A protein has these predicted regions:
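Hydrophobic positions on the alpha1 helix immediately C-terminal to the Walker A/P-loop
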Residues: 174, 178
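The conserved Walker
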Residues: 102, 167-168, 322
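Residue-level signature of catalytic and energy-coupling elements of molecular machines
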Residues: 22, 39-42, 46, 87, ...
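P-loop NTPase switch/communication element
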Residues: 156-159, 183-228, 333-334
């Protein structure tokens, strides 16, 4: 396959792929009248159960429409949340998600799935204003939020991400969008990848990509070794930063670029003169954690927890996904050390609480519909994933 390349990156022998190779989606006309009509039905359905409301506004997104409602005086918010099944029945919707209240507003949000969903293409996100503003090499495309804005996620500030969702909910498409974003935006000198794919079918397409530190790992036992290597590399980088007197990878690389790093006299283990190298970011992607936990649970958990606790400062970041969000896969230690979560549709309320520590993921409609819970946020953001 021949891939069209763009111009050479300044100061690098590499050229980034041309944005033209990514598919763009067709423009989609919004049916505002149909959305308004459903808003009227929504108010009537609530009034039939004795809850008087006023429709403040509505936001039409690619997957759902959010109706913002103010309730009458003396009406408890819990009255509305208890009527979710009745609301879904009145609107002939598969399910609805209720935000009571919308964070920062004196209104209740009711999210109703659109009759026709809009396709969100990765090419659209990477061509957006938000992508052009992105400066960090680990900012990746995720999708569009409920207001239609492109969402770029900075994995460096997360600094690690835990993804969970049922089979077919869109986890692998999301991971592919993230990896493709790295390949489209950065050169191998800046970001390196370790891809762990026990399912054997998702990561094979990246074989031979220059960003890879090793071929995609499909054997769960070898995957445990790859994670252990990442731990050793983290420790080596801390040793280098300690000797050079820098707190993190940003300060070290800036000093390297300025030419401020002077290696001490002497030879390394191979008899070569000691030198300092620029440290690339390393992104470790695990596409199915449950398979690894079945084979080497203790080793895998130890490596993931050590990386999650310490690796941020030296530029090593984790993206860990599983289709089985149970406590024997997403253990308490792993959850405690990876505060950023991305939840796709799950089968039950219990699964939603394992991944998000709150309800909501059981109300998602699948096919890339997700909730992003940032490391310092208590209210998840609803996003339609890019494809």
């Amino acid at each position: 396959m021949i891939i069209q390349l763009g111009e050479l990156v300044a100061g690098s022998p590499w050229a980034l792929p041309s944005p033209e190779i990514l598919t763009r989606s067709d423009t989609h006309d919004v049916d505002a009248k149909a959305a308004e009509a459903r808003g009227v039905i929504l108010q009537e359905a609530l009034a039939a159960h004795g809850v008087e409301t006023r429709l403040v506004d509505m936001t039409i997104g690619p997957t759902v429409t959010r109706y913002a409602l103010q309730v009458g005086e003396g009406v408890k918010v819990s009255r509305v949340t208890s009527l979710s099944k009745d609301i879904a029945y009145s609107l002939a919707a598969a399910d609805v998600r209720i935000l009571a209240p919308i964070p920062g507003r004196q209104a209740i949000g009711i999210e109703v799935p659109n009759e026709e969903r809009e396709v969100v293409a990765l090419g659209d996100i990477l061509a957006s204003v938000e992508a052009r503003k992105a400066r960090h090499p680990l900012e990746v495309a995720v999708g569009r939020d409920i207001s239609g804005r492109a969402v770029m996620l900075d994995l460096a500030t997360m600094p690690h991400l835990l993804i969970a969702g049922a089979t077919g909910a869109g986890k692998s498409s999301c991971i592919n969008a993230m990896v493709t974003s790295i390949l489209m935006r950065t050169t191998p000198e800046v970001v390196r990848l370790i891809l762990i794919d026990p399912k054997r079918v998702e990561m094979g397409q990246y074989e031979g990509v220059p960003h890879l530190l090793t071929a995609p790992v499909t054997d769960p036992k070898k995957a445990a070794n790859a994670l252990h290597w990442a731990v050793r590399e983290m420790e080596r980088r801390y040793d280098v930063l300690s000797v050079c007197g820098y707190r993190d990878i940003g300060g070290y690389n800036a000093a390297y670029d300025r030419g401020d790093l002077v290696p001490p006299p002497g030879l390394d283990e191979e008899g070569e003169l000691l030198t300092y190298d620029r440290l690339p970011f390393i992104l470790v992607v695990v596409d199915e954690l449950s398979d690894l936990m079945m084979v080497a649970a203790r080793d895998v958990e130890d490596s993931i927890c050590r990386l999650a606790q310490m690796a941020r400062a030296v530029g090593v970041h984790l993206v860990v996904a599983t289709q089985r969000p149970s406590v024997d896969v997403i253990t308490g230690l792993i959850k405690a050390n990876i505060p950023a979560r991305l939840a796709f549709a799950v089968a039950s309320l219990a699964d939603s609480r394992v991944i998000l520590d709150q309800q909501g993921a059981e109300r998602l409609v699948g096919m890339g519909d997700m909730l992003l819970l940032g490391p310092s946020s208590s209210a998840p953001q609803r996003i339609q994933g890019a494809w």
